[in-house]
Amino acid sequence: GMDLTSALTTLQGDDMVYGKWNKGKSELSFSYDVSGYKTKGEKSKQSADYTLTDGSIYTIERNDVESLRKSISHDAKLTYNWSDSTATVFQASLNGAFNNTPDNYTVKDIVDGTRQYKATSRAKDKSYSPVLDIYFFRQLTPCQSVTANAVATYISTQTSSYYDEGTPYKYDVDGKTASLLSEVI
């Protein structure tokens, strides 16, 4: 089947394709979902009043003059099942998520007391995380059974953020982790 959703006034959507097939004791299913957006020119105005120790008020105004926001996400899952209703169950599932938010930015006009200048913020983010899950069950006798399960996961994240309102501030993250969990009962 399919489920498609798109906005008419903005670049925004969420679309899904899925299916399932059965044959004998086996079943194969999949799903794929993609969603994303792109907005340009969103603006906000901010005014902050600070009361100083001498009782005077100090005002800073931040007004957006230019901006771009965009992001896309993909999620996919593939599952295989085999089942003998009297004794055995096997299931293998592979799913993954990929997210990308490239080069978003905002440019602001700053009025800081008597000074006026521009400030820029930039951000980008990318991550993906595949997961493999395997399950097995076998009834050996009416009182004995074996169950086994294993899950393997990998996560990768890359993030970069930059802001300059007079003094630049930047940080980057590049993180990766993997795990394997299993049990037999």
Protein language model annotation of sequence segments:
Residues 107-118, 167-169:
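Solvent-exposed, glycine/polar-rich loop segments of beta-barrel outer-membrane systems
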Residues 124-129, 164-185:
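Outer-membrane beta-barrel transmembrane domain signature of Gram-negative proteins
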Residues 1-107, 121-156, 185:
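Membrane-proximal, glycine/serine-rich, low-complexity loop/turn segments characteristic
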Residues 57-61, 114-117, 179:
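A generic short-segment signal for beta-strand/edge and adjacent turn/coil regions
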